[in-house]
């Protein structure tokens, strides 16, 4: 059963009527451009065919009653008083989104009964949190007939995650969940918010393999990496590392390394990764999978050696995939790091061989069982 069907059926069962509003927002996978978004840089994700559905109906008071079907937990809060934090982590994503929409539209106090259901694997690096934030934001927009664009909804979700949940994420995850296009990757300029759709070549599959090494960005090293990048930007006297070219970095690399070796390594990753995204757009335009594969490999090496966010299980998965696909595609870690998933672009006729080499070796070597997905690039948030 899809998240949409599940949310609607459970709502009907609980409330004895059909929901007036159902919205759906997808998760995402980032093909290239990691930890560049909060440095005002470039990313190239696509929305995927896994996501989060929210079904609900207006109430005649100010109360939100929210049931998270997949967790079997309920949260309730009022919109006519200051919205406090919940002890349920998932509920804070919902509360944060509503709180910041209220800041923008103080008259928005419409109560609602909601059911949430999703199939984005939690803590996998595929943006279950952004899908939830964007779905709830779109639900609010429909509920209150608010003049919010999909970009507004995305940035409101980011604000909720930064300021209410406490994860200092960039804006990529929410933007792609809101703005994704079917069968396209979306190159996003995280400063101007300009998007450039790039078709996924027809003969290419988007493969995601979850290492099932759990990660938690709120308590992890994510915020430390962000501080190190800000330190490097200050050294170059720029607003963000986006403003430093590869040549400019190389000229002063030794100087920064002497001052702060870690900041230099982090900056080297971000500066070179931004260039790799721009090069990847050109490679895709030319249908040059060999070039794209090299860029993805260089991205992974940079995350492993300079940004230091991969783990041995992830590195091993990438090695296995590269053995099979050779020069006909690429593989790299995707997401915030410290576990989560790898992404690979490979010809459809290599998918079974990729699946087999991982099934034969990964669990035997690591003691963990992978989860294997073949995804399609999908449309962003929508009303059902």
UniProtKB/Swiss-Prot annotation:
Against InterPro entries, the record matches this protein to: Galactokinase, Galactokinase_bac, Galactokinase_CS, GalKase_N, GHMP_kinase_C_dom, GHMP_kinase_C_sf, GHMP_kinase_N_dom, GHMP_knse_ATP-bd_CS
State its Enzyme Commission number(s): 2.7.1.6
Q: What is its main location?
A: cytoplasm
Give all cystine bridges in this chain: none
Q: Which amino acid positions bind substrate, per UniProt?
A: 34-37, 222
Q: Which GO terms describe its molecular function?
A: ATP binding; galactokinase activity; magnesium ion binding
Q: Where is this site: Transition state stabilizer?
A: 28
Judged by the first EC level, this protein's enzyme class is transferase
Q: Which function does this protein serve?
A: Catalyzes the transfer of the gamma-phosphate of ATP to D-galactose to form alpha-D-galactose-1-phosphate (Gal-1-P).
Provide the protein name.
Galactokinase
């Amino acid at each position: 059963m899809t998240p949409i069907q599940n949310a609607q059926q459970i709502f009907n069962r609980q409330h004895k009527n059909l929901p007036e509003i159902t919205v759906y927002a997808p998760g995402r996978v980032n093909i290239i451009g990691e930890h560049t978004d909060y440095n005002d840089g470039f990313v190239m994700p696509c929305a995927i065919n896994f996501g989060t559905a929210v079904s609900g109906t207006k109430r005649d008071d100010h109360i939100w009653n929210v049931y998270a079907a997949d967790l079997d937990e309920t949260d309730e809060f009022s919109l006519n008083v200051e919205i406090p934090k919940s002890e349920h982590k998932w509920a804070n994503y919902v509360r944060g989104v509503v709180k910041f929409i209220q800041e923008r539209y103080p008259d928005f106090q419409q109560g609602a009964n909601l059911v949430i259901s999703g199939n984005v694997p939690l803590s996998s690096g595929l943006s279950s949190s952004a899908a939830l934030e964007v779905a709830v934001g779109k639900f609010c927009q429909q509920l209150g007939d608010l003049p919010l664009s999909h970009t507004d909804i995305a940035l409101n979700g980011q604000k909720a995650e930064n300021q209410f949940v406490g994860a200092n994420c960039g804006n990529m995850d929410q933007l792609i969940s809101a703005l994704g296009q079917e069968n396209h990757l979306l190159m996003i300029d995280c400063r101007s918010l300009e998007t450039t759709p790039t078709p996924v070549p027809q003969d290419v599959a988007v493969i995601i393999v979850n290492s099932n090494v759990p990660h938690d960005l709120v308590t992890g090293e994510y915020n430390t990496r962000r501080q190190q990048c800000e330190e490097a930007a200050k050294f170059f006297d720029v607003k963000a590392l986006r403003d430093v070219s590869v040549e400019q970095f190389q000229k002063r690399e030794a100087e920064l390394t002497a001052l702060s070796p870690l900041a230099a390594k982090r900056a080297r990753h971000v500066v070179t990764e931004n260039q790799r995204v721009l090069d990847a757009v050109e490679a895709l335009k030319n249908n040059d999978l060999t070039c794209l594969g090299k860029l993805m490999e260089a991205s992974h090496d940079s995350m492993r050696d300079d940004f230091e966010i991969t783990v041995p299980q992830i590195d091993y998965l990438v090695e296995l995939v590269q053995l099979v696909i050779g020069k006909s595609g690429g593989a790299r870690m995707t997401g915030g790091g410290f576990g989560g998933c790898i992404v690979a672009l490979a010809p459809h006729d290599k998918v079974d061989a990729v699946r087999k080499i991982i099934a034969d070796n990964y669990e035997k070597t690591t003691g963990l069982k992978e989860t294997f997905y073949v995804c399609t690039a999908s449309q962003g948030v929508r009303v059902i």
